[in-house]
UniProtKB/Swiss-Prot annotation:
PROSITE patterns: SAM_MT_TRM5_TYW2. Coiled coil: none annotated. SUPFAM superfamilies: S-adenosyl-L-methionine-dependent methyltransferases. Belongs to the class I-like SAM-binding methyltransferase superfamily. TRM5/TYW2 family. It catalyses: guanosine(37) in tRNA + S-adenosyl-L-methionine = N(1)-methylguanosine(37) in tRNA + S-adenosyl-L-homocysteine + H(+). GO terms for cellular component: mitochondrial matrix; nucleus. It comes from Candida albicans (strain WO-1) (Yeast). This is tRNA (guanine(37)-N(1))-methyltransferase. S-adenosyl-L-methionine binds at H216, D254, L255, D282, G283, N345. Monomer. The keyword Transport does not apply.
Length: 449
């Protein structure tokens, strides 16, 4: 064990920070004349103490000193060149006691010193963070030590004020889980920044996953200003609000009343009211009604969204030095009567909703006569879990998902035009994909009862 390892107490029930005090005896090279410090450091690197967060140059007796390697007991333990420099510079070796306390060690090091020995190989010191709240997923064997783990995480991360764990892994229909407060304040109202937007929500009542921020931005990057997007399982707006900031027209839906409430609040916080309409419907109902909801919005605005922006405008072009003033300008965006994209970020079950797109425009066949008409791109997130004894290739997993989609929409998609993107590995046997494909005309305009 290193001299710089924390003390060990595997019987600790409540965190005792005072237990983590340690004195490390060292030798210091004291410089009566500190002008030689730089030369010594340059020439004697191998004999200097380099430990993360420990400053090897210290103040001592009205001058400076350099801490030497922790295994140095006398001058004879130093390299010959270092011994020469000590004599040349008139350096004096003096004993020095390095005092370490709880603040010195990282959370993982602290936890490895207090958890049972059979649990130290995979210490749960990592977490996802939303605002001031840290969310950890403790495996069953670590749950008895949850309070200890939570307190250490709280102590070691200044931006964290609340630490929670899932009570179980079974989500309700709103994708939320019962939470246990492990440490800190029982405050679940968080404020989170993502994609240049601000989000406010109750972490205990809505779905939010900070690990998906890259995926949010990837999908948003596919939208163009003036596109219409249907966000079927929109949550508090991680897709919808950043998209609407770039003048994308979004109809955002979520079944959870709490998500709907915070979606409305986040729309106001980010001042994107002109470009987004929130809905609190079941996903199937939202898809069925999507064309009608868009048409209602189109008609209520006479087909135009007006947005007031402030621009610098030149008010005198005749003078050598131009004079500008800030003026409100009305920027207009045409509202199409059709969708360019649908986002379905509900990986547990989104695939099962795809059959609702059959006949999406079946009652409005004249829509395809619009010279600007485009069929929507569906972006559906899904898991494709496999057994521990399997070793499927990415192509095999893609085929499994592809076959499910074709069966659900009752149409053989051209697989070459289907995009598969692996979002992340939730577990070693549970990849999360986003599959993007254009809804075929035969499906979109199919006549249904």
């Amino acid at each position: 064990m290193s001299k710089f390892s924390p003390p060990i107490n595997r019987n600790m029930v409540e965190l005792d920070r005072s237990f983590f005090y340690k004195e490390v005896p060292l030798l210091a090279a004291y410089f009566p004349n500190p002008k030689f410090l730089g030369q010594f450091v340059k020439s004697c690197q191998n004999d200097i103490l380099y430990v993360q967060t420990v400053k090897h140059i210290i103040s001592m007796d009205d001058s400076k000193a350099i801490l030497l390697r922790d295994d140095v007991k006398s001058i004879s333990d130093l390299n010959p060149e270092t011994q020469l420099k000590i004599n040349e510079f008139g350096i004096i070796l003096k004993p020095y006691t390095l005092k370490l306390d709880y603040s010195f060690w990282k959370s993982e090091e602290i936890l490895k010193s207090i958890l049972p020995e059979n649990l130290i190989d995979d210490v749960p010191s990592g977490f996802s963070q939303a605002g001031h709240l840290a969310h950890i997923n403790l495996r069953d064997e670590y749950k008895p030590f949850g309070k200890l783990i939570g307190q250490v995480i709280l102590d070691k991360n200044p931006s964290v004020l609340t630490v929670v764990d899932k009570v179980n892994t079974i989500a309700n229909k709103f994708r939320t889980f019962p939470l246990e407060l492990l440490a800190g304040e029982p405050n679940y109202i968080v404020e989170q920044s993502e994609s240049g937007c601000k989000f406010k929500f109750d972490f205990s009542k809505v779905y939010w996953n900070s690990r998906l921020s890259t995926e949010h931005e990837r999908i948003i990057g596919k939208f163009n200003p003036g596109d219409v997007v249907g966000d079927v399982f929109g949550g508090v707006g991680p897709f919808a609000i950043p998209a609407s900031k770039k003048n994308v027209i979004v109809l955002a839906n979520d079944l959870n009343p709490e998500s709907y409430k915070y979606l409305q609040e986040n729309i106001k916080i980010n001042k994107v009211e002109p470009f987004i309409k929130p809905f609190n419907l079941d996903g199937r109902e939202f898809i069925r009604k999507a064309p009608e909801l868009l048409l209602q919005w189109h008609n209520s605005q006479n087909g135009i969204i007006e947005k007031i922006i402030i621009k610098k405008v030149s008010i005198d072009d005749n003078k050598t030095k131009k004079i500008f003033e800030r003026k409100p300008i009305i920027e207009t965006t045409k509202i199409p009567k059709f969708y360019h994209h649908f986002v379905m970020n509900l990986p547990d079950s989104a695939l099962t909703f795809l059959d609702e797109f059959i006949g999406l425009y079946g009652s409005n066949p004249q829509l395809k006569t619009d010279p600007e008409f485009k069929l929507p791109i569906i972006h559906v997130h899904c898991f494709e879990k496999f057994e521990n004894n399997e070793n499927p290739t990415p192509e095999e997993l893609h085929n499994r998902v592809y076959e499910k989609i074709c069966k659900l929409i009752q149409f053989p998609l051209n697989k070459k035009k289907v995009e598969f993107h692996e979002v992340r590995m939730v577990s070693p046997t549970k990849p999360m994909f986003c599959v993007s494909f254009e809804l075929p005309e035969e499906v979109a305009f199919k006549q249904t009862k």
